[in-house]
């Protein structure tokens, strides 16, 4: 309810109760989800229950200072870490062929994330006694002795840092930072058309 309006009087009929969605099974559904999570953890044991995801920036200028887990690693990040896309998907790494790396920082961050995951990885041979060599060497041990209680192998890093106090507050307040950023974006947007217009004006008219 908003504003100073009169309260609505719902003149309901008995047959209208079937058009209302109820959730009397909320506690039972909560229990079912718990059993499903346990069944999934038992099925993928000794692997983590979640696959490895990249660290990405949130969208829009308002939220892009914080990070979150993305959909999957780019092909450039996998190539930098020396992992093929097919092999990555087989060892619990999510791959997103649509995402692109816009800066070197994100590429290096996720490359380190991949290498940290691979350094912790323990692979067991598909066929007993036939271990393979590669980026991650197979072990001769059986998987029965392995233990893994982690939900995810490489958690999301905490990037929040406490800012140091500065003394030149008065000078900083005089600068209209948002206006400067918007002006630079506008200049970048119209740079091509302005150059074309200047070039057309500089050419001699026939």
Swiss-Prot record:
One of its GO terms (biological process) is translation. Residues 184-193 have a biased composition (Basic and acidic residues). The gene is RPL13. Residues 184-206 are annotated as: Disordered. It comes from the Eukaryota. It comes from Tetrahymena thermophila (strain SB210). This is Large ribosomal subunit protein eL13. GO terms for molecular function: RNA binding; structural constituent of ribosome. HAMAP family: Ribosomal_eL13. Coiled coil: none annotated. It holds the Pfam family Ribosomal_L13e.
């Amino acid at each position: 309810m908003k504003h100073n309006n009169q309260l609505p009087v719902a003149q309901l009929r008995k047959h209208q109760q079937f058009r209302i969605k109820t959730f009397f099974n909320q506690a039972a559904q909560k229990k079912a989800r718990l059993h499903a999570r346990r069944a999934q953890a038992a099925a993928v044991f000794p692997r983590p229950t979640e696959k490895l995801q990249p660290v990405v920036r949130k969208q829009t200028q308002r939220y892009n200072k914080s990070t979150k887990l993305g959909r999957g690693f780019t092909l450039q990040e996998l190539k930098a870490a020396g992992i093929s896309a097919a092999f990555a998907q087989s060892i619990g790494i999510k791959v997103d062929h649509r995402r692109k790396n816009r800066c070197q920082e994100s590429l290096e961050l996720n490359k380190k994330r991949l290498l940290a995951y691979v350094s912790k990885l323990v692979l067991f041979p598909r066929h007993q006694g036939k271990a393979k060599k590669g980026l991650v060497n197979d072990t001769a041990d059986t998987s029965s002795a392995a233990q893994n209680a982690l939900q995810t192998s490489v958690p999301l890093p905490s990037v929040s840092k406490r800012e140091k106090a500065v003394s030149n507050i008065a000078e900083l307040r005089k600068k209209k930072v948002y206006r400067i950023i918007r002006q630079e974006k506008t200049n970048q947007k119209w740079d091509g058309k302005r150059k074309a217009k200047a070039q057309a004006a500089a050419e001699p008219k026939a």
